[in-house]
Every structure is written in C-alpha cells, then in structure tokens.
A protein has these predicted regions:
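Short beta-strand->alpha-helix linker/helix-N-cap micro-motif
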Residues: 1-56, 69-75
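Amphipathic beta-strand/beta-sheet edge segments enriched in Tyr/Trp
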Residues: 51-118
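Short loop/turn segments that connect beta-strands within beta-propeller blades
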Residues: 91, 157-161, 201-205, 247-251, ...
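A flexible loop/linker signature enriched in serine peptidases of the S9 family
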Residues: 127, 139-152, 168-171, 188-197, ...
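Short coil/turn segments that connect the beta-strands within blades of beta-propeller domains
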Residues: 132, 181-183, 225-227, 271-273, ...
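A short beta-strand motif characteristic of beta-propeller blades
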Residues: 162-167, 206-211, 252-257, 296-301, ...
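Blade-level signature of beta-propeller repeat domains, shared across WD40, Kelch, NHL, RCC1
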Residues: 374-405
Length: 405
C-alpha cells in the first residue's frame, strides 16, 4: 500500500496545483495492479506538517502504508512550476527516490505522470506507462456536417485527459499507430475515395500519402526502430491480401507472403527480426510467425475458434490476440513459441488489443451488445483490473504510444 497525500503549496494557487498533481498520481496508482492507495481520510499528517517536519513514520505504518509519497510545488515569476517529490519506505524510514522537475504550468499533468512512472520503476523494477497517449478512432453516429457516421483520428492521455481529434471526419480513417519518436501517426484513410496509407505529422497536422498502391492498403505497423512498416496490400494478385514490408528510408517495398489464403494484421517482434500475422491458410483464421524476410512461416495457434489482430508485446514475451469462440470474443495472450494460451476477457465484441510500452497492460475496444456503443478498456496480464477509459464518442482501434519523456 502507498500513501499519496497532497503536495504542499505555500499559497492558494500553488496549493491547487499541489492537490491536482497528487490527485493524478493517486488515480494512476489506484488503476494499476501492483498498488493499493491508502484512503486520505486515514492520514494523520497534513501537507504542511510533512513539509515542515517531515514524515512521522509510525503514523504512516499505523495506517498500513508501506510507501509514502510527499512533495511540494512552487510557482516562479516566469510561469514555471517547480515540483519536488520524495518517496519513502515507511518500514526502513529511508528515502527511496527523490527528484525535482521544472516545467511550464501547462504541462503539470505530464509531470504528474512522470512522477508516477518514477515511482512505478522504483517499486516494481519495471518501467512505468503513465506518461503515454492513446490514439484511436472516434466514431460519431448521427448527422454531423450533413453526414451519417463519421470516423476521426483522436488522441488522449492514458487516463482520458487532454482529448483531441486530429482529423475532421470528412474521410474514413482506420488502424492508427504511433511511430516510435511520437512525431507521426500512420493510418489508413479513404481521403481520395480509395483505401491508402497516410502519415499525419503531429506537430503540423499535415497528412502525407505513403504510397499509392493498387487495391486495399491496411493494417500498417512500425517496427520498434521506426525504420520499417509492415502492411497488408492486395496489389497485383487478384485482390488477395498479402503482407508487405516498406523501408521508410528508401520507400522500397518487399513482398513477404505468397499464399492464396488471406494474410493480414502483421506485428513486429521487439527485435524486428520476426513478424506475427493472421492467416486463414490452414482453413480458418489462426496466428502465424515468420522471419522478416518471409521465411520460416510457422503456425502459432491450434485451439478451437478463430484468431485475429495479433500484437507482439514490447517485452517480447507474449503475443496478444482476439479470439472468437462460439460467438463470444476474447482478448488473450500466448507465448511466441506457442504453448498454452490465456484468455483475459470475454464479451459480445472485444477487439484490437495493443500493449502499453512496459508490456504489462493492454488497451482494447469493447462493445457489450449489438445495441451498445464501442468503448475503450484496459486490463492487466492477470485478467483483473479491467477499467473503462471514458471518451466523448464511440471509440475503436486503440494504440498505445511509447513512453513520453
């Protein structure tokens, strides 16, 4: 258990930032499996007392807090926010980590997430995932601008804050993914009436077509370095979907699969030497792996049901997927070498799993019934801690960003 009292602020404005920072940090931990947040009503020291005299550790041990986070906030004359924090082990009465950040006041939420990541790393030994964003398709049903259903490219923080749409809905968009440096989003769009792959430049909002390939262009995925993109194309083979790879430097295209079955939804291993994909070449949709030159195609899943939408964990240890079994959709995980699969969810329609950058949490879309809208959810690898990420519209096709420094 961890205690997260409000940070200290010497005046009302600083105290407001101090309370807001602590609230974001506390919510991050409350929504993360390794942590249990001690209720603030049990705290025996105020932020001012903590700032003036430091922690009275027996008081914190008495409310079963193993870890204690304290901090302070100060505003500078040029609109900067100075944030200082300390994390203590209440049993040893020792400071575990402490740090000072200075940032423009506009970015106070980001600092709250950075502090959360610092503490997550210190207490679990693994990287955090709080200073991240989630891109997805925001879907508006009904009449807007004289149109029916509209699909927009939208992004938000991992806790649903700072929500914004990047496209106006005039063109259908699908399958968005961040590139590793967070400067671009790759996605499929019908901007000119044809399904083509585009980049959206995050700083400028400019959209650029990647390549005008004949037929269907879909499911683009970057490798971990951002130097290659795997995609599904139907060009030149009678409309049959195959996996291709594009070198982003030279823009050269290489075909990887050669089969009359439907091959789609590629996802790179973290090392970039293998790809997992979906194919019905065995009679029904299953998952396969191959080397990135197209060799050594190996079937991964043999269970009952149909498998879709594979996503290789950034840790390399698991592959997430969608499984449809007897009319029920599941999010599951499996070892890249095969073996026993684990199903984490079940619903009318669970779809599009992607990983947090630490490889320990998944985000996916869920439609609970035929008449329900689609929403975004996260779940950890235990299959517990399922939580909804609120969005103002229907939301599908999510993808997690890398950690934002």
């Amino acid at each position: 258990p961890i205690a997260t009292p409000d940070f200290f602020g010497a005046n009302p404005e600083e105290a407001r930032y101090a309370a807001d920072l602590a609230s974001v940090i506390s919510n991050n931990f409350a929504n993360s499996t390794p942590f249990k947040v001690v209720k603030k009503s049990a705290y025996l020291q105020t932020p001012a007392q903590l700032n003036q005299q430091g922690p009275v550790f027996p008081d914190w041990r008495g409310i079963n807090a193993d870890a204690l986070l304290t901090g302070s906030v100060a505003l500078t004359g040029d609109g900067q926010l100075k944030v200082e924090y300390r994390l203590y082990d209440t049993q040893s009465e020792q400071q575990l980590v402490g740090r000072r950040y200075t940032v423009d006041t506009r970015f106070w939420r980001h600092i709250a997430h950075r502090i959360s990541d610092d503490i997550y790393q210190e207490l679990t030994g693994e990287p955090g995932y709080f200073a991240t964003r989630i891109v997805h398709i925001g879907e508006t049903k009904g009449i807007e601008k004289g149109k029916g259903t509209m699909k927009k490219l939208c992004v938000m923080d991992q806790d649903s804050a700072n929500y914004q749409c990047l496209t106006d809905g005039s063109s259908l968009v699908l399958s968005p993914r961040f590139n590793p440096n967070l400067q671009k989003i790759i996605y499929m769009s019908y901007a000119n009436g044809l399904p083509r792959l585009y980049f959206l430049d995050m700083p400028t909002g400019q959209q650029t077509i990647i390549g005008d390939f004949e037929g269907l262009n879909s499911t683009p995925r970057f490798n971990a370095k951002g130097t290659k993109v795997a995609m599904t194309l139907t060009q030149g083979h009678e409309g049959n979907p195959e996996i291709y790879e594009m070198d982003m430097g030279s823009r050269t295209l290489k075909r990887l699969t050669y089969h009359r079955g439907i091959d789609t939804s590629p996802s790179y291993s973290p090392e970039g030497d293998k790809i997992v994909f979906n194919s019905d070449r065995g009679g029904q949709p299953a998952l396969y792996t191959m080397n990135t030159d197209g060799s050594n195609v190996t079937r991964l899943t043999y269970g009952d049901g149909r498998y879709y939408a594979p996503a290789w964990s950034p840790r390399g240890d698991l592959i997430a997927f969608v499984k449809e079994l007897r009319g029920v959709f599941h999010i599951g995980v499996i070892d890249p070498q095969g073996g026993e699969e684990r199903l984490l969810t079940d619903s009318y329609m669970d779809d599009s799993p992607t990983w947090a950058p630490n490889g320990r949490v998944l985000v996916f879309s869920r439609q609970k019934s035929r008449s329900d809208i689609s929403r975004l959810y996260t779940i950890d690898l235990t299959g517990y801690n399922l939580r909804e990420l609120p969005t103002p519209t229907n939301a599908t096709d999510p993808a997690w960003s890398p950690l934002i420094k």
